[in-house]
């Protein structure tokens, strides 16, 4: 394992204390860098900054496809159906398989409470064809816990890839749940 902060580099670090000592030895590390390394060490190298960057990349990738036409069964990048769009974005940005269909994506990803929703999560709805079952999926762009509303990006059958709001009556009555990609 090789971690770098500034010009300090630690290789095969066994303990947090050794890591901090190595940073101090180089003389380049400030308190913020040491604190960040401490956080990285305790969280197996996964930092909040990395998660935010990952979500930002997913959102940027999704938005770059605004206006792309809808074609049932299409997996992109020139056209998408709803699950083809979400799976393409996650596979293209993070090389993560999230499932092929909206039902599979709903089944295999981590259930979370609506109140815990955040950007990058998958949001699910019924569709006219699916009855009470999951039939549509999008990617959450933002969530307002005060109003319990969110915006999301998805491949719409009539308008292609677009941004919608949970306050639209069509989606209000069809909301099923939210999942976090594992």
Where are these regions (language model features)?
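Aromatic- and glycine-rich peptidoglycan recognition patches
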Residues: 3-18, 22-32, 134-182
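Mature, secreted membrane-active peptide modules
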Residues: 41-62, 68-71, 79-82
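Catalytic cysteine-centered active-site loop
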Residues: 64, 68-119
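Thr-Gly-centered strand-to-loop micro-motif
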Residues: 72-73, 125, 165
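...with weaker cross-activation on analogous glycine-rich loops/strands in unrelated enzymes
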Residues: 96-159, 168
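Generic helix-packing signal
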Residues: 66, 90-93, 124, 142, ...
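N-terminal targeting signals for Sec/Tat export/insertion, comprising classic cleavable signal peptides
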Residues: 20-53
